[in-house]
Amino acid sequence: MESYGLGQLKNFEYLDHTADIMFHTWGKDLKEALEQMVLIMNNYMVELDSVELDDSATEQTISVNGHDMDSLLFALLDEFLFVFSTEFIIFKQVQIISFDRENFSIKAIGKGVELDKSKHTTGTEIKAITYSCMKIEENPDKSDIHVIVDI
């Protein structure tokens, strides 16, 4: 199975927030920061260090649309959360392969395995993505994203 040079979790931090949990990710550009956001969401539910991409690994293509950047970010996270919640696939690698800023659409490939509680260290369940305090900041050399999720 080809890996398509899928990105791996590296740029993130958990920030305390009174309501739930806020994720902060960053990257050299918005695409990398978005990939990191999907990965940190998965990492919060299952420690990605405990996930091995073996012969059982599967790749899924996720396509989402929005009406602005915030709704696009929401849709991306919500779709990956839906796959985890319904198919129990934990994604260890994510790569955005198409990012249309004018039409607010993203196509991403996620590579992961089915959750196995005997092998994987589980974290906290995420119930929903929220728009609360959602922030996307783009600068020439770095992009940052903040998202609060309901746990």
Curated annotation (Swiss-Prot):
- Which cysteines bridge via disulfide bonds? none
Where along this sequence does the record place binding of Ca(2+)?
D20, D150, I151
Gene Ontology biological-process entries: tRNA splicing, via endonucleolytic cleavage and ligation
Q: Would I find Transcription regulation among this entry's keywords?
A: no
Q: Does the keyword Glycoprotein apply?
A: no
Family assignment from sequence similarity? Belongs to the archease family.
Q: What is this protein called?
A: Protein archease-like
Q: Which GO terms describe its molecular function?
A: metal ion binding
Q: Which UniProt keywords apply?
A: Calcium, Metal-binding, tRNA processing
Which source organism?
A: Dictyostelium discoideum (Social amoeba)
| Superkingdom as given in the UniProt entry | Eukaryota
InterPro entries with a match to the protein in the record: Archease, Archease_dom, Archease_dom_sf
* GO CC, any one term: tRNA-splicing ligase complex
- What is this protein's function per UniProt? Component of the tRNA-splicing ligase complex required to facilitate the enzymatic turnover of catalytic subunit RtcB.
